[in-house]
């Protein structure tokens, strides 16, 4: 039978770089993998060819021998004891793709770090949990103690989290001898799979706990008290170590992460550690000056002087009346912005007074006078 060209199998040129060869292999292996082409013998045969080709071309010495002697370099007939390759004695196709196989198919093979990655992974850490918490601006200012109910799992009390009846220790899996993997030989090709007996755990529970059915944990709601520090803002994350999902079979629990959202306030707007408050003032107070009382986030009141001739948008600052910094560093300010109100629902007498005021106010409106002077100049220019 004619032997296939390894470069053609991977779809690369003879001068392809190691990275190009690896990239081509990954693409082919993913496309032809038996778990994705079950029952298709042609795809299985091509998959073997792809791995055989990659086993040679990824290795500098084997590649050099193949480039010089072709397939003869791996047939054991070279008097000089040439390299023995993927089809020769001692060949192990699993090595041909061990460096990328886990990366490609780790999700369903278990991966190096997961249950199917070899080694004894009976005790597994529990998953982390997320809890979204809304707090008021006042709570963010002062800090608060909040009680929450967290759904999730806890260690089984009946088996002490071991998963075995009576708290007995799990036993080494007889199928994989504790490795968590089994190997299947298919001709020249060796495939590693997650052990079907222990699910990659490496150990089995002979008599599963009747309460948790061998998992070592049970579903249970928990009530927790959470300390909300002063200065939190939307997006602040609080970590409660060990308050996440219970671990599997005695493994450590995960963590609980509290994500803070601060509700909008009816009076104050927040920008970091500073607070903004828009305060309405009458036209008379803005013109003559005066004093206005404003609330503060701590529940108190402060009096602010309104300068004579104030316009809408004028800002004044109250030092130290803002929000505290989350991790120290002082307290922000409160910025007061004036909003001059135009009176409505006037009485006849008020209208009369305003009409009189209108007639004599021209010289007292510097911005208005300047604007209309500019308009007049504009019109004069258009006429010219």
From Swiss-Prot:
| Record keyword Metal-binding present | yes
Please provide, alphabetically and separated by semicolons, the GO molecular function terms listed in this UniProt record.
ATP binding; heat shock protein binding; unfolded protein binding; zinc ion binding
- Names of the cofactor(s): Zn(2+)
Binding, Zn(2+) 2: 173, 176, 195, 198
Tell me the compartments it is located in: Cytoplasm
The CR-type zinc-finger regions cover 143-221
* Residue runs in coiled coils: none
One GO biological process term: protein refolding
What name does this protein carry? Answer: Chaperone protein DnaJ
The species is: Rhodobacter capsulatus (Rhodopseudomonas capsulata)
